[in-house]
Structure formats: structure tokens, C-alpha cells
């Protein structure tokens, strides 16, 4: 009887086993063919950030969520490979993808608990999960993981599997892969890790947060000890090595990639350009972009601009705290403040700080980055003293939780504030358009708006040289005499009213030459010139410099620079004068490399005298250069003569009510444009002239940029003659008699041809605003618009 029962039980058990094996076999047969392809492993391309470099190899920008440096398995030190294997998969080189003994041990524990509480995932299984599966704990997911692990083992070598694991695994602190983790936790190359450091990092894959040695040092130390004991058990190290590693004091020096702060505006320009081309892939494909800017030029440009903005703001009253954080509910105020300050940047030696307390005497206690506390008395508060607990200032008052800026002056801390005035500086290689320096404002972190390329501003008198160049092309000369006298134009003002423009200084010089008029920036002469040649002709001609129709008003006010454009566009346009009349396109990207170091693209710039189109007659460019040398020598930009160079030319510009101030100066090699103004346009007052606030910025930068470079000046082209100290085109020594110049002191009447040009100009402007790239067939040929010519280069670049 008993025998029969045993036989029956055994039969049932055997039957269930066969049935179970059958089910598993069927599941395998059904699931295995549906497993994903291993292409992503065989052709592994981890997400790697976009890195942007200056021309001299400094990192100026990095974009991407995952910080990773792909490393071949042979470049990881043996001590780290052994530590990871001892921690995660002791039988890695002996199993077929699944550790059967480990699975059995985990299965017993899971059956006892009644749920999936633990696993015995091998490194291969972790690779399968990290690349293809979710992290949910279900038997179905685990089954797929086992099959994938087997498939991976059949297709890849053990070392390749280990390489994938070492580069893909997340290890906390935004570190992906052990090479990145070595930098972030110990600030060293992965090849230089000690045994103790390797064992500490090897403990992170199990639980990056729980075993983070910075946040949880005690738990991390226990994990390190466990791994070292495993290494000893596997005969990877000796007892002496284990004990020495356990006693080694580890120094955690978090790696902070040094990104040059002076070129952030340039880096953002590159980021946008690559994003437009590649979308989100721009941040994951490991592109390395080399730009045309140099860090030393960037630093000089940044300091030159900041110096002027600081000086202007020096007499301003305190505008209030820049932010506020509520500390009333914080359990650990010091930690709360430290965390907040870690996200702020020190700008121009202005350190962010948070107010911790305001005393009865209205002194202030602040916390600096790093946790240091400093007491500020009324002397240290200075101009900000009136803001301390001043209810009239509302949310901007200095109180507990207020975020302010302080600066260390010879050991004493004092409250400071960032200037409200803004500006931009752009410096180009005149022959290629390569950007050598570009600063878009006082501080990129506080305001990312790039005034060099995004701020549409009136260029004021810096626009006049283009009108004068058009006049030379039309038939005038540098010695053409024009009456600098008041003018009144009925119907040319707002709503058809009388327009009565004035010279900026309110003084008039009578009959003067074009050279004298541009040198002194005479508005009346510019208007009379434009009336003579016609607005329509001027518009068409000036488009040769790269301006769009919408930037060229169809009115006489164009002579005074009332159109709106950007500092970069103005600098690019002036390069035509500097390089002998050729049209080049500005660009910041030089080369792009892929993750493997292969050259992906290289800029093919238009070069003056080679492949760049001739925009204007080289003789015209030369004569304009000689005229604008006088602007620097004896005119409105004579402050630029401080450089002591004879090859410099340029033009200042100031708009109505001193809202915008400009100076564009150049020699045959370099063009640099400086713009100064408030983001919300308002008068800068008496200090807001181009010659007083923009020229000093230009001088400070160009003193560095031109250091050690000889001033040769522009070579006189063929067909230019000199007579009585003036320069002329050989065939045009006198003004074209067909041009009507009304030099009376009353409103001059434009010629019939000028009237026709003006009417055409209005029509062209209206149509041009809706179609910037339309090529009008007028009196003068027009080159492709700036956007079109640049796009042609980008097409060749990408």
C-alpha cells in the first residue's frame, strides 16, 4: 500500500516536473525569437555630451544630461576590474550569463518571503536590464533577462560585456561609467585609482545613493570592506593589501569641469546652431566643436565691457536684493543656504550671499558659499544701508533670507550690485569673418539674452559711412562740399508733420566737405547727401554690406541710422571697408569632430581676395577708410588714438536722447564693434555718447588684441589718386554735375530721379519685410542677403 502511494506521488511529481519543463521550453521557444536585436550592444554608442572648445582648446561649454567618457576595457585598471567582479559577479568568467548557484540561493529566499525580494543578477544580466528592460521586479521581466543574458553571452566576448557594463552603469552624482565616477568622486583619471578607491567605487552599482561615500560614508565603508574581503577570498589581493586599503584615508575631491566663463555667450550660439541641425541628438552624440574665439581675447573683451558698465553704475543708488529665500521653515538653515548658494555663480568677483540675520543696529550677518559667516556693519553696507529692513522697498529690502552680492576689497567685505546698464562687443577677422571675441552682456548667468546677436538696436551715426559710400559710388567725392545748415522738411515727420532734424551738438559749420562732415558726424550733411542720391538708390547699395531691407528705412531718417540691427551685423558690414571691399560672413564654428575623433565638418569661409564676392569698389573702400581715419585722429572717436596707432579707422554712434552708444573701429585685419545701452531703452545721460562710453571699451580690448602687431594700414588700390591731401577715384576728381545738391538753409527740393527712388524705396521696404530674400532688379546689383550667404557655408559645413 505504502509502495503504491509512493509510486503514485513520485509519478505525480515527475509529471509535474515534465509539465513544468515543457511549459518553460514552450516559453523559451516563443520568447527567444522575439528578443530584441543586439545591434545597440555590438555597435555601442553611449550618450555623450556636446563639448564646445575655444580655438586654443579650452572648454567653453558642455551640454547634455549624462556626463560620460567612453573608455576601452583595457584602459580600466586591473584593480578596478577585479573589485567590480568581486562585488557584482564573482563567477563572471565561469558562467554562461546566469549564475545558477546564485539564482538557486536567491530563489529560496524569494519563496520564503513570498515575493521577489532579491536577485542574483550577473553582470551580463545587468547589461541586459540596463539596455533593454525595465527595473520592475516581476518573474516575466526576470525570465526575459535570463534569456537576453544567454543571447548576449553567445554574441559578445566577456571583455566586451564588461566594457559595456563599465561605461553604461549609473554611479550617482550624474556619473555614468567608472571613468566619469573616478573624476567626480576623486578628481582623478580612472587609471590612477588606488585599491581602496576602486573598492569604494565598486560598491556603487548596487545602490548609488545608499553607498555614496560623500553622503553615507559609514554605509559606503561597510560596502568597501565587503568587497575587499571578497577580493581576498578570490585571491585577487593579499591580506596585507586588504588591511592597507581598509586603513587608507580617502579624500573626496569632487571634480568640477573647468568651463571658461568668459565665452558662455559663444557656447550658447554654438549650442543653438547644432540643435537646429541635429535636434536632441546634439546633446547625446559626443560632438566636439571647436570655435574661432580665443579665451585670452574673450577674457580681455569681457573685462573691457564690464569695466565700463561698472564705472557707469558706480554712482547709482542701491536697487535692492536680487532674490529672496524663505528660511522660516528650514530645519537646517546653514545647509539650506549652502544648497541654494551652490547653484549661483561668482561674477566679476561679486560673490553671492544670503542674509541670516539683521541686528537691532541694522547690521547684517551673511553666509557665503562654503558656509562662512560674515558680519557687515554700516560701513560695509555702504550705499545699501538704507535698504536694511526698509519696508518702503517692499520685497527688495535687505532682510533675513535676502540674496545679495558682496565683494572682498583688501580683506573687507562690502555690498555691491550688478550694473543695470548692458552692452556687447564683437570682434571679427576682417578677411574671413571669423569671430575672435564676442560678449553679449555683463553676465550670462543672470541674463542669457545675447545682445551681440539678438538685440535689435538703432546704430545711429555708425550707419553714416554706408550712406557716404553710396554717395561716392553715385558720383560724389571726399571733397564734395555740402552745407551743414538747419533743415526743415514738411511732411517728413510723424503723421505728416514737419521734420526738423538737428546736429547732436546743436552747432552748424556751413559749407564743409564730406570728409569733414563724417569726421564731425554732421547730421544735416548726411540728410542732404541722402536726398541727393535718393533713398531707393541708397537702400539698394547698402544691401551690399549684408543688411536686410527691413533694416533700411525707406525714409531720410535712414541717414541718421534709425533702422534696427545687431552689433554682429554692424561689425560684419564694416569688414567690407576693412578688407578692401569684400563681403565675408561672420561665423563662430571652425571644426566639428564626432565621438571617435573623426572630422565631421569644417567651416569653409569666404576669404577676402580669394573666394569672397566683391561687394563694393576697392577704391571706394579705401577712400572711406582714409576718411574714417580722421574720425579717430581728430573727430568724435579721437579717444581711440590713445592706442598710438596710425592704421586705425572707425565711427562713433549715438541715438536720440543718448539711449544707445556705439563705436566700430578697425584696421585691415580686425573689426571690433562695441554697443552700450539699457535693455529697456532709456537715456544714459551726458555720459552716454559713443565717444565717451563705447570708445574706452574698444580701446581696452584692442590694446590687447593688437599687441605686438604692426600697423601697416591699407594698401592703396590701383585707380586711386591723391591730390592736395585728398584721395579720389582716378576717373572722378570732381563731383558728378548730374547730382543735385541743394545747399540752401531751407528745405531742399529733391531731384526728380531721387523722388522716383524714394517712392520705389517705400514699395521695396513694404515688400522686403515679408520677403527678406527677394532680389530686386534696380539701379545697382545686389549681393545675396547675409542669411543666404551664410547658409551656403553652413551647407558646406554640415
Curated annotation (Swiss-Prot):
SUPFAM superfamilies: beta-lactamase/transpeptidase-like, Lysozyme-like. Residues 31-798 are periplasmic. Its main location: membrane. It comes from Neisseria gonorrhoeae. Residues 766-777 have a biased composition (Basic and acidic residues). This is Penicillin-binding protein 1A. It is a single-pass type II membrane protein. One of its GO terms (molecular function) is penicillin binding. Cell wall formation. Synthesis of cross-linked peptidoglycan from the lipid intermediates. The enzyme has a penicillin-insensitive transglycosylase N-terminal domain (formation of linear glycan strands) and a penicillin-sensitive transpeptidase C-terminal domain (cross-linking of the peptide subunits). Essential for cell wall synthesis. Disulfide bonds: none annotated. Pathway: Cell wall biogenesis; peptidoglycan biosynthesis. Residues 783-798 have a biased composition (Polar residues). It is found in: Cell inner membrane. The active site is at 88 (proton donor), 461 (acyl-ester intermediate). The keyword Transmembrane applies. Keywords: Antibiotic resistance, Carboxypeptidase, Cell inner membrane, Cell membrane, Cell shape, Cell wall biogenesis/degradation, Glycosyltransferase, Hydrolase, Membrane, Multifunctional enzyme, Peptidoglycan synthesis, Protease, Signal-anchor, Transferase, Transmembrane, Transmembrane helix. It catalyses: [GlcNAc-(1->4)-Mur2Ac(oyl-L-Ala-gamma-D-Glu-L-Lys-D-Ala-D-Ala)](n)-di-trans,octa-cis-undecaprenyl diphosphate + beta-D-GlcNAc-(1->4)-Mur2Ac(oyl-L-Ala-gamma-D-Glu-L-Lys-D-Ala-D-Ala)-di-trans,octa-cis-undecaprenyl diphosphate = [GlcNAc-(1->4)-Mur2Ac(oyl-L-Ala-gamma-D-Glu-L-Lys-D-Ala-D-Ala)](n+1)-di-trans,octa-cis-undecaprenyl diphosphate + di-trans,octa-cis-undecaprenyl diphosphate + H(+); Preferential cleavage: (Ac)2-L-Lys-D-Ala-|-D-Ala. Also transpeptidation of peptidyl-alanyl moieties that are N-acyl substituents of D-alanine. In the N-terminal section; belongs to the glycosyltransferase 51 family. In the C-terminal section; belongs to the transpeptidase family.
Amino acid at each position: 500500500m505504502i509502495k503504491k502511494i509512493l509510486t503514485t506521488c513520485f509519478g505525480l511529481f515527475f509529471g509535474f516536473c515534465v509539465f513544468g519543463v515543457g511549459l518553460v521550453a514552450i516559453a523559451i521557444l516563443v520568447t527567444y525569437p522575439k528578443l530584441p536585436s543586439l545591434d545597440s550592444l555590438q555597435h555601442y554608442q553611449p550618450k555623450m555630451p556636446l563639448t564646445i572648445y575655444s580655438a586654443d582648446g579650452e572648454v567653453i561649454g558642455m551640454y547634455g544630461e549624462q556626463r560620460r567618457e567612453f573608455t576601452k576595457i583595457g584602459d580600466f585598471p586591473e584593480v578596478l576590474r577585479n573589485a567590480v567582479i568581486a562585488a557584482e559577479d564573482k563567477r563572471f568568467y565561469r558562467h554562461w550569463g546566469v549564475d545558477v548557484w546564485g539564482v538557486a540561493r536567491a530563489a529560496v529566499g524569494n519563496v520564503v518571503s513570498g515575493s521577489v525580494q532579491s536577485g542574483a543578477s550577473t553582470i551580463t544580466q545587468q547589461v541586459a536590464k540596463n539596455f533593454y528592460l525595465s527595473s520592475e521586479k516581476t518573474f516575466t521581466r526576470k525570465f526575459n533577462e535570463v534569456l537576453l543574458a544567454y543571447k548576449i553571452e553567445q554574441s559578445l566576448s566577456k571583455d566586451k560585456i564588461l566594457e559595456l557594463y563599465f561605461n553604461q552603469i549609473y554611479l550617482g552624482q550624474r556619473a555614468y561609467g567608472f571613468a566619469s565616477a573616478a573624476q567626480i568622486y576623486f578628481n582623478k583619471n580612472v587609471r590612477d585609482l588606488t585599491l581602496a578607491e576602486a573598492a569604494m567605487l565598486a560598491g556603487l552599482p548596487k545602490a548609488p545613493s545608499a553607498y555614496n561615500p560623500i553622503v553615507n560614508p559609514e554605509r559606503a565603508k561597510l560596502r568597501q570592506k565587503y568587497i575587499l574581503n571578497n577580493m581576498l577570498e578570490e585571491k585577487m589581493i593579499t591580506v596585507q593589501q586588504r588591511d592597507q586599503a581598509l586603513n587608507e584615508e580617502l579624500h573626496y575631491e569632487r571634480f568640477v569641469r573647468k568651463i571658461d566663463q568668459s565665452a558662455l555667450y559663444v557656447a550658447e550660439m554654438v549650442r543653438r546652431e547644432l540643435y537646429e541641425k541635429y535636434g536632441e541628438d546634439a546633446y547625446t552624440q559626443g560632438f566636439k566643436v571647436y570655435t574661432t574665439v580665443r579665451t585670452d581675447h574673450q577674457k580681455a573683451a569681457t573685462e573691457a565691457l564690464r569695466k565700463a558698465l561698472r564705472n557707469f553704475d558706480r554712482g547709482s543708488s542701491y536697487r535692492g536684493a536680487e532674490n529672496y529665500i524663505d528660511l522660516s521653515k528650514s530645519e537646517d538653515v546653514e545647509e539650506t543656504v549652502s544648497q541654494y548658494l551652490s547653484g549661483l555663480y561668482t561674477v566679476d568677483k561679486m560673490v553671492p550671499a544670503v542674509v541670516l540675520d539683521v541686528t537691532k543696529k541694522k547690521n547684517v550677518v551673511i553666509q557665503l558659499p562654503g558656509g562662512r559667516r560674515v558680519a557687515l556693519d554700516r560701513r560695509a553696507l555702504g550705499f545699501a544701508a538704507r535698504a536694511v529692513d526698509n519696508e518702503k522697498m517692499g520685497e527688495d529690502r535687505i532682510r533675513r533670507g535676502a540674496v545679495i552680492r558682496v565683494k572682498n576689497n583688501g580683506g573687507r567685505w562690502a555690498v555691491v550690485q550688478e550694473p543695470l546698464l548692458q552692452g556687447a562687443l564683437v570682434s571679427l577677422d576682417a578677411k574671413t569673418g571669423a569671430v575672435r571675441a564676442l560678449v553679449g552682456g555683463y553676465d550670462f548667468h543672470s541674463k542669457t539674452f545675447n545682445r551681440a546677436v539678438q538685440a535689435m538696436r538703432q546704430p545711429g551715426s555708425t550707419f553714416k559711412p554706408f550712406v557716404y559710400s553710396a554717395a561716392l559710388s553715385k558720383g560724389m567725392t571726399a571733397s564734395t562740399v555740402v552745407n551743414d545748415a538747419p533743415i526743415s522738411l514738411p511732411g517728413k515727420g510723424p503723421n505728416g508733420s514737419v521734420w526738423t532734424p538737428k546736429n547732436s551738438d546743436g552747432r552748424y559749420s556751413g559749407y564743409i566737405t564730406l570728409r569733414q562732415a563724417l569726421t564731425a558726424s554732421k547730421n544735416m550733411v548726411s540728410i542732404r547727401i541722402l536726398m541727393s542720391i535718393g533713398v531707393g538708390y541708397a537702400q539698394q547699395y547698402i544691401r551690399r554690406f549684408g543688411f536686410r531691407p527691413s533694416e533700411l528705412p525707406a525714409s531720410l531718417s535712414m541717414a541718421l541710422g534709425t533702422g534696427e540691427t545687431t552689433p554682429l551685423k554692424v561689425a560684419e558690414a564694416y569688414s567690407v571697408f576693412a578688407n578692401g571691399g569684400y563681403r565675408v560672413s561672420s561665423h563662430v564654428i571652425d571644426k566639428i569632430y564626432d565621438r571617435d575623433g573623426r572630422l565631421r565638418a569644417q567651416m569653409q569661409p569666404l576669404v577676402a581676395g580669394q573666394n569672397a564676392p566683391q561687394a563694393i569698389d576697392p577704391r571706394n573702400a579705401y577712400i572711406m577708410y582714409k576718411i574714417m581715419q580722421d574720425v579717430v585722429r581728430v573727430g568724435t572717436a579721437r579717444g581711440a588714438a590713445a592706442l598710438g596707432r596710425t592704421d586705425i579707422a572707425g565711427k562713433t554712434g549715438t541715438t536720440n536722447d543718448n539711449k544707445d552708444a556705439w563705436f566700430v573701429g578697425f584696421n585691415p585685419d580686425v573689426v571690433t564693434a562695441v554697443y552700450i545701452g539699457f535693455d529697456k531703452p532709456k537715456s544714459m545721460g551726458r555720459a552716454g555718447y559713443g565717444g565717451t562710453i563705447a570708445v574706452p571699451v574698444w580701446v581696452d580690448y584692442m590694446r590687447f588684441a593688437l599687441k605686438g602687431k604692426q600697423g601697416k594700414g591699407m594698401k592703396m588700390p590701383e585707380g586711386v589718386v591723391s591730390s592736395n591731401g585728398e584721395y579720389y577715384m582716378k576717373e572722378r576728381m570732381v563731383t558728378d554735375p548730374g547730382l543735385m545738391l541743394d545747399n540752401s538753409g531751407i528745405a531742399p527740393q529733391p531731384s526728380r530721379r531721387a523722388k522716383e527712388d524714394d517712392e520705389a524705396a517705400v514699395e521695396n521696404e513694404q515688400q522686403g519685410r515679408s520677403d527678406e530674400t527677394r532680389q530686386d532688379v534696380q539701379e545697382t546689383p545686389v549681393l545675396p542677403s547675409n542669411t543666404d550667404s551664410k547658409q551656403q557655408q553652413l551647407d558646406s559645413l554640415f
